[in-house]
Amino acid sequence: MLDILRFVLICGILWILRRVLLRVFIHSPLDKIPGPPPVSFAKGNLPQLYDRNGWDFIKGLGEKYGGVVKINGLYGAKMLFVFDPAALSSVVVKDQYVYERSEDATKSTRLMLGDGLLTSQGETHRKQRKLMNPVFSINHMRDMMPIFYQISRNLRDAIASRIDNGEKEIDVLDWMARTALELVGQAGLGYSFDPLVQDKADAYAEAIKALVPTAFGLRLYRPLLPIALKIGTPAIRRRILKLIPSTRLQRMREISDAIDAHSKRIFEEKKQALARGDEAVLKQVGAGKDILSRLMQANMTASEEDRLPENELLGQMSTFIFAGMDTTSGALAHTLQLLAEHPDVQDKMRAEIVAALGGGQEIPYDTLVDLPYLDAVCRETLRLYAPVTTVNRTAQEDIVLPLSEPIRGTDGNLIQEIPVPKGTEVIVGILASNRNPALWGPDAAEWKPERWLEPLPDTINTARVPGVYSHLMTFLGGGRACIGFKFSQLEMKVVLAVLLSSFKFSLSSKEIVWNVAGIQYPTVGASGKPEMPMKIDRVKNT
């Protein structure tokens, strides 16, 4: 077994050496694209881009170089950082099937999450979305409102029981993460992960929370994955994996195993309930209205051509949990922090919510989604603090990238379009696009919910940013736009409506730092632990 491990290591070194030599000695069309110097040849600019304070680096790219910038990847790789609107349209809409996820990114995600939307490509991806689009429809969102409200009330009661004696400091991120998991569990999978009663979160929730930071720490090894997956059988590869003395790698294996085991158990229970008939389905969590039940029922009646195999249905489960937990919980936590920083906005938003409740417990779907100030606060938070800051795509063939505005090359000439060689990694600058002052104006870096209560700048409307949501790249666009973005919006609005009608949120004395790398998450000061303490008190009736 050790001989196989040495063989894998030698193959990896030779593969890296070959790629390095090709990059050093072969001329690239990207050589004339301006960009910052690398930190080092081995790491390029990636330490700056993925630093916890990476926004300063991203902001500098736009100010100095424009909407398309050449940055340096691992071992001399030439990459493009893109937030020019025309270039974005090409990458995520017009030429979306040329710009796919890289082989190593796809395979590493598949190992963690299975064969879901995040790992499928081409015809398989189109087939999966075709079957899944109806279960994310507005009509289905209406059906899930009782689930959303019940879980949000459970959260409210849990917080209320902890502040009986007055204002108390509570880790808001932890509670938002637990709530997001329970929402995606019940509404997405028809399964309850966490009743929101105990102070300690569910062990499965803890594993999911650790997934992104753990995987992010292994990103430098990802290019070796395609080679490693060609060696032996899965059983042999697993034995080799257990021999590698890496705490982070072994933690990643444990997390992946936990996700897989939990998903299979839920799936089997759901299959058995569907086989027993309607009465058994109604007795399950969610009463058969959850996304997975609807998806499995649709799959059973689909044509042979459109039907998904079980491994792809299982993959959707892991994808729901992964995509729906960290992103939404982070967005909710950030919104509450911003409301604490702007108490006048919090008061105005609370007044709107209380008026809409009219003394009742729930705001109907149509009324809730149309509350103007609540909607403005959510949109502005998702604009300025998009949970996912960048996504990566790789050109599967040679292609030309159009530009809205020309950039000046390193030779002094204006560049109107960029030839992109096959294999080039393109980084979609989600946060950079959302904060682009050329589109949003000089106050683009300010949190101003009121901007959504008046007409947006003409520069926004004419730019045609290809995002599926409000001229923003937060949920991407095209065939790979976030399929659950309406689910996420509804989740945010219901939770905020329930919490703000009962509680007042204030800032902790502790310094909160938002880490930009990958998925944004808060920490206290220089700590690496995701958390966000806030002071919470009951709303005083007047």
From Swiss-Prot:
Domain of life, source organism: Eukaryota
Keywords: Glycoprotein, Heme, Iron, Metal-binding, Monooxygenase, Oxidoreductase, Signal
Gene Ontology terms, MF aspect: heme binding; iron ion binding; monooxygenase activity; oxidoreductase activity, acting on paired donors, with incorporation or reduction of molecular oxygen
Listed Pfam families: p450
Membrane-spanning segments: none
Pathway: Secondary metabolite biosynthesis
Binding site for heme: 482
EC number annotated for this UniProt entry: 1.-.-.-
Signal peptide range in chain numbering: 1-22
UniProt keyword annotation of DNA repair present: no
InterPro entries: Cyt_P450, Cyt_P450_E_grp-I, Cyt_P450_sf, Cytochrome_P450_monoxygenase
Glycoprotein found in the keyword field: yes
Glycosylation sites: 299, 392
Similarity annotation: Belongs to the cytochrome P450 family.
Biological role stated in the UniProt entry: Cytochrome P450 monooxygenase that is able to use dehydroabietic acid as a substrate for oxidation.
UniProt name for this protein: Cytochrome P450 monooxygenase 91
Organism: Postia placenta (strain ATCC 44394 / Madison 698-R) (Brown rot fungus)
Lineage: Eukaryota, Fungi, Dikarya, Basidiomycota, Agaricomycotina
